[in-house]
Amino acid sequence: MSTFFMFGKYTQEALNSISAVRTRKAVNMIQKLGGRVKSVYALLGNNDLVFIVSLPNAAQATVASIALTKMTGISFTTSIAIPAEEFDKQFNHNKN
């Protein structure tokens, strides 16, 4: 499983529909795709929220991002999170 950060930006319509029920539906949808929601945070700044999720692969992350946008009206940008240890190892491996 890989970790993904799914950053969301509310539209006015999505903002007006904030609810715990919608959040639970989003979590359930990720689980149906074979994933697990590690955390969900509301943010201040450029993004309004972030889902930190584990999913089998980038293809499933893409499906989840599109499905969440369709379900919630929230625009999502999804990024894979690479553990620093793994990133350092790959970087040093490619330097040689």
Where are these regions (language model features)?
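A compositional/biophysical signature of low hydrophobicity enriched in polar/charged and small residues
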Residues: 1-96
